[in-house]
């Protein structure tokens, strides 16, 4: 048996040796690849589009008792800034039902297109001022400022400016639970939805929405009353996503002793968290702490002396936040301030009302701020230094303003004029696209 195994092993070794000799004598075969040829491909961004939500919506007629009556009242003024681009769809200077602005251009930012809508309201059941940026349609978003109870009316303005139908899912987050609602929108359709048809006697709620495929415009209109007296109106666009750091700019306290600003917090997470709230003005600093339970709200009255404040809300768990602020003069009105986006460069049109610019520096070092204010063909340049955790305010006069800095800043426009009060919280306008280098083998 051992002899047979040895014979098989010797035969295998001889075969392996012979195969190596044969392979060594075969001609070598080489494989060559073509020289890579880089191709430059230009990918242009889509036309930049923003949407203005339109004029004030009156529910129930002027008397408030006409069941099912929903009307747009008057017109909202449109203030467009157009940079080095061309309008595909011109928004015009007035709108009732809402309007689009669509432009082509290379510089995809507010330097290409920036639009604001504004409207003063004077009705038997509603007085005040509404203003907001006209923003890009979005696939999803949040609102913190919901209120649907006695003396508090909320109306959702939902528009589908696309050429495709879509389904919008609304999730109303109320203390102790949630209420779901779906709205189907045809291409180009606008839906006006009084929240009272869905929820009632909920003085506090947040809202999350999401679409089934195409971006939409969603705005929240609010009206406040006390008995037969009007207490103001407001128009808000979606807030930023819940975050562990919320930065709020342009809180002007002008009603000390009447109605304190109220900070609302919502914790969408599953664990409790403590919010550290810092309110800073030129002559006052207040630091507060507030526990926010999971899937719950907390409201904090900010006992602040009159002045201009920036607000920072920090937490270990992402929170949604906003401040409801009231002014007394020149008209009793309110506005919701929500977290601000950070910019290095921002261009805004200036509404034809008494408008102040607030710019805040939440960074650790001072920043240099450069302003370019245009009035017709005239341009005025100004520069300022803003210390760390400080805010700069300037009364504006002109058609548009460009704000630029090497460091990150936040900004807000505040209107306090005869019709009332509004805070305009800008957002970036941008579609992505650039030149690509593609290597083809």
What feature does the model see in each segment?
Residues 2-64, 115-159, 216-268, 319-365, ...:
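Conserved functional hotspot residues at active sites or interaction interfaces
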Residues 57-99:
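Extracytoplasmic/periplasmic/luminal assembly and interaction segments
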Residues 81-98, 175-206, 283-310, 376-400:
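Intrinsically disordered, low-complexity Pro/Gly/Ser/Thr-rich segments with frequent PxxP/GP/PP motifs
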Residues 155-179, 264-284, 360-379, 407:
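Short acidic, flexible loop segments centered on an aromatic residue
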Residues 239-307, 312-314:
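Long, internal scaffold/assembly segments composed of regular secondary structure
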Residues 93-128, 157, 161-163, 189-230, ...:
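Hydrophobic, ordered structural segments
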Residues 82-86, 91-101, 106-111, 116-145, ...:
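A general "mature secreted/periplasmic domain" signal
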Residues 74-77, 111, 154, 164-169, ...:
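Short beta-strand/loop motifs in extracellular/secreted proteins, especially
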């Amino acid at each position: 048996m051992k002899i047979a195994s040895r014979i098989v092993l010797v035969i295998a070794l001889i075969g392996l040796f012979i195969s190596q000799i044969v392979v060594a004598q075969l001609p070598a075969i080489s494989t060559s690849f073509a020289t890579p040829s880089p191709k430059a491909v230009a990918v242009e961004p889509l036309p930049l589009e923003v949407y203005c939500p339109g004029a004030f919506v009156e529910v129930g007629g002027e008397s408030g008792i006409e069941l099912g009556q929903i009307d747009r009242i008057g017109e909202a003024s449109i203030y467009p800034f157009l940079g080095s681009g061309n309008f595909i769809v011109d928004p015009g200077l007035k709108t009732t039902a809402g309007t689009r602005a669509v432009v082509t251009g290379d510089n995809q930012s507010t330097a290409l297109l920036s639009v604001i809508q504004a409207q003063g309201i004077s009705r038997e059941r509603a007085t005040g001022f509404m203003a907001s940026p006209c923003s890009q349609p979005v696939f999803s978003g949040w609102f913190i400022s919901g209120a649907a109870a006695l003396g508090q009316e909320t109306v959702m303005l939902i528009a589908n400016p696309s050429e495709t139908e879509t389904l919008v899912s609304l999730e109303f987050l109320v203390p102790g639970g949630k209420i779901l609602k779906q709205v189907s929108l045809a291409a180009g359709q606008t839906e006006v939805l009084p929240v009272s048809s869905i929820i009632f006697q909920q003085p506090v709620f947040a809202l999350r929405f999401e679409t089934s495929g195409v971006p939409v415009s969603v705005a929240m209109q609010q009206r406040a009353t006390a008995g037969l007296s009007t207490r103001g109106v407001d128009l808000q666009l979606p807030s930023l996503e819940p975050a562990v750091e919320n930065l709020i700019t342009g809180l002007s306290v002008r009603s000390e002793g009447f109605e304190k600003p109220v900070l609302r917090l919502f914790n969408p997470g599953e664990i409790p968290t403590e919010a550290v709230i810092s309110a800073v003005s030129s002559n006052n600093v207040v630091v507060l702490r507030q526990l926010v339970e999971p899937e719950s709200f907390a409201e904090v009255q900010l006992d602040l002396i009159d002045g201009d404040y920036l607000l920072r809300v920090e937490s270990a768990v992402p929170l949604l936040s906003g401040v409801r602020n009231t002014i007394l003069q020149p008209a009793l009105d309110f506005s919701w301030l929500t977290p601000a986006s950070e910019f290095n460069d921002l261009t805004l049109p200036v509404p034809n009302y008494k408008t102040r610019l607030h710019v805040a520096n939440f960074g650790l070092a001072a920043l240099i701020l450069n302003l370019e204010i245009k009035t017709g063909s005239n341009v005025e340049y100004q520069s300022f230094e803003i210390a760390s955790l400080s805010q700069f305010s300037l009364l504006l006069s002109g058609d548009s303003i460009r704000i630029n800095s090497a460091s990150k800043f936040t900004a807000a426009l505040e209107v306090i004029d005869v019709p009332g009060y509004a805070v305009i919280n800008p957002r970036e306008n941008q579609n992505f696209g650039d030149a690509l280098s593609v290597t083809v083998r």
